[in-house]
Amino acid sequence: MDTPRPIKRALLSVSDKAGIVEFAQRLSEKGVDLLSTGGTAKLLAENGIKVTEVSDYTGHPEIMDGRVKTLHPKVHGGILARRGIDEVVMDENGISAIDMVVVNLYPFANAVSDENCSLENAIENIDIGGPTMVRAAAKNHKDVTIVVNASDYERVLTELDNNNDSLTYKTRFDLAIAAYEHTASYDGMIANYFGKMLPAYGETESKASLENKVKFPRTFNSQFIKTQDLRYGENSHQDAAFYKEENPEEASVSTATQLQGKALSYNNIADTDAALECVKEFDEPACVIVKHANPCGVAIGDDILAAYEGAYKTDPTSAFGGIIAFNRELDADTAEAIVSRQFVEVIIAPSVSDAAAQIVAAKPNLRLLECGQWDNKTTGFDFKRVNGGLLVQDTDQGRVTSDDLTVVTKRQPTDEEMRDLQFCWKVAKFVKSNAIVYVKNSSTIGVGAGQMSRVYSAKVAGIKAADENLEVKGSVMASDAFFPFRDGLDAAAEAGITAVIQPGGSMRDDEVIAAADEHNIAMVFTGMRHFRH
């Protein structure tokens, strides 16, 4: 099984033609006979590369508008033939061995991503012959090489150059795994696409008429690609790795470029994601500092230095060893303020100035990430693994504007309070429930996270503010869910809160509103909850 296999005949049929001409030219120079189909054969011939059309090889033309091209015993017999076993059968049927298959599949994902794609067009972009050849070659990897990724062309050529025009079993096996991953992803995309259309079955072929398709398909297929093994997971006794989606969202922790620092840990990645997604909520220059997936300081300012100063003063103790995210370029002044003041695990920003990078370089272990700019169009699903199952939901993209707010108390919030309330609400969305956030002048002054009762989260927020000598009087408060009792309002009033934002919807809303009126607190309802677990 470990015997290297020479490459004497290759079949090339690709939708993505990047690099295929150069690859085929090198194979041809090595004396490899090339078989090809349709557009690939035409492209190779136009570039002066000797190639035999599969239809000429099989003696059977492409039929049904190209639906049937390679589905022929001379093709699949040549791929599946077991060397040393099937030669007699091959000779009897005029079948030649095919040693390498180079195939990538019809661009189904690209086709259906077009909102004008009809069901008929989607169907025509389902590859049949391609996956069949890929699976056949992967199955027979003992004798046949399968290449599905253009990124592997150079690797294959290099090994052929260094190994007497042969490929090792190790390489063939590795490429076979890549082939199965490729077809699994492809079939998963098709299953997801059609699985969402179940309610509309038989109605029409127009995608526009399928707007009532289900959001969650009958089976959920998603492929993630391992980008790195991690030293350990949340704890040192847990093994871990980091995987990213096939087409990850831009400006995310999965696509960020690490400019310097130690390798990211499991907790670094999780906390950096929490910080980055929170800072994306703000249009103004903003800074978010996260510890254990909770914001411990958030602020906006005229620039990111002012925002950092505001976020840091919320809770300098918790900020130690935290993650810092910005929604503007990291500049030299802000970088200097950070490295001269605190120990930080990760800094992430859309971009990093050269001067800032030089300053951070003085702390070589500090992980500095550049994520690029975003367009505030985060979509997709959140996943939560449970024993034996998977919970899937939309990402929480719920946002409110001043038009969505209902003032339910006798006193109206002032303009300044209203600005702080809306800021406070954005922060509360990213704090673990039960979440209470105190804000003053567009900066958090106390965060109460993860308490089992809402009133204790309110007390924790007040304690945190007091510990840092921050003045609560005149600040506002956000609660991620309704107050089941008036005690949360009483605690807020005792701390000096003057305005509150919350979803409303409690059976005791009247009691809570009465408590707010008693304390002359202005209160607004959002009608939207932001539980986070």
UniProtKB/Swiss-Prot annotation:
Which reaction equation describes what this protein catalyses?
(6R)-10-formyltetrahydrofolate + 5-amino-1-(5-phospho-beta-D-ribosyl)imidazole-4-carboxamide = 5-formamido-1-(5-phospho-D-ribosyl)imidazole-4-carboxamide + (6S)-5,6,7,8-tetrahydrofolate; IMP + H2O = 5-formamido-1-(5-phospho-D-ribosyl)imidazole-4-carboxamide
* PROSITE patterns for this protein: MGS
Pfam families, per the entry: AICARFT_IMPCHas, MGS
Q: Where does the record place the MGS-like domain?
A: 1-148
Which terms are listed as keywords in the entry?
A: Hydrolase, Multifunctional enzyme, Purine biosynthesis, Transferase
Looking at the keywords, is Transferase present? Answer: yes
CDD domains (UniProt xref): IMPCH
UniProt entry tagged with the keyword Membrane: no
Q: What GO biological process terms does the UniProt entry carry, in alphabetical order?
A: 'de novo' IMP biosynthetic process
Specify the pathway: Purine metabolism; IMP biosynthesis via de novo pathway; 5-formamido-1-(5-phospho-D-ribosyl)imidazole-4-carboxamide from 5-amino-1-(5-phospho-D-ribosyl)imidazole-4-carboxamide (10-formyl THF route): step 1/1; Purine metabolism; IMP biosynthesis via de novo pathway; IMP from 5-formamido-1-(5-phospho-D-ribosyl)imidazole-4-carboxamide: step 1/1
**Enzyme Commission number(s) from the entry:** 2.1.2.3, 3.5.4.10
InterPro entries in the record: AICAR_Tfase_dup_dom_sf (IPR024051), Cytidine_deaminase-like (IPR016193), MGS-like_dom (IPR011607), MGS-like_dom_sf (IPR036914), PurH-like (IPR002695)
Q: Which GO terms describe its molecular function?
A: IMP cyclohydrolase activity; phosphoribosylaminoimidazolecarboxamide formyltransferase activity
According to its record, what is known about the domains? The IMP cyclohydrolase activity resides in the N-terminal region.
Which PANTHER family does the entry mention? BIFUNCTIONAL PURINE BIOSYNTHESIS PROTEIN ATIC, BIFUNCTIONAL PURINE BIOSYNTHESIS PROTEIN PURH
Protein's recorded name: Bifunctional purine biosynthesis protein PurH
Q: Which organism is it from?
A: Colwellia psychrerythraea (strain 34H / ATCC BAA-681)
